[in-house]
Structures are given as structure tokens and as C-alpha cells.
Amino acid sequence: DYEEGTFTASYNTTAGNIGTVTYDARTARYTKIGRLVYITIRLRTDSISDRGTGNVRITGLPFTHVNNANARAVSTNLHTAAWTADDSPTSILIQHNTTYMNLYQKDYNQDTTALPVAALNTGANDNDIRISAVYETSQ
């Protein structure tokens, strides 16, 4: 089974309460080969009316990640620009049985922590992220 397509990726929060987000760059593509889904995402915001609460995530993945707690997916490539100083994402994690990815950062102790919504800038040409990742689906 082979499939190619596009999907709509969006910034959101773990609480699901981000305000209106306007994007000046927003592309997302996938290739599905068997049960593996290869994705590329590019998001850059022009404005965010309200950051909301919780931590930052990207929603709208084209297929649900396999429902297996041992089958988490991480990014194979991640590039970021125009985030709040010292608060840019350094990795992603797609939780099992979901269609979203949570964003993470390295803190001053080099521990990986969830990226707080305070890291989101609300101005133009901000929160630029480019991701390539692979994950498994049961579909």
C-alpha cells in the first residue's frame, strides 16, 4: 500500500485552547508506505491572538499513530527559528494512538522538558519550524 498527500498541521496546546493563529507559511506532506508514514511539516506564524495554556503541540497528522506504548515516534530532522530566546523546540514526540506531536526543549540542565506556551511568539514571522519524521500507523 502506497499513498501520498497533504494534510493541515496546526499549532495548538495540550489544553486545546490556543487562540486564533494566522500562518504565513504552512505546508505539510506525507508519504505512506505500508504502515509507515513519512511526514514533512513547515509552520511559521504571522500572529497568535492568545497563547492559551499548557504546552505546545502540533495537531492534524494524517494518520493515527499505532496504539502501542512502545512505538513512539521522534523527529529525524528538526529546524527552528524565531522563537522566544532560549525556548525553541529541540525535539518532538508523537504519542501512541494520537494524531498530534508534542514539542520538547532542552533546559539548562540538558534535561528534555515539554515546551511551554510562553515560548510562542505572537508577532509576525515567528515560531518557524521544519520537521521530517516517520511514525507507524495501524491504518
Write out the residue ranges for each language-model feature.
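Surface-exposed molecular-recognition determinants
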Residues: 1-139
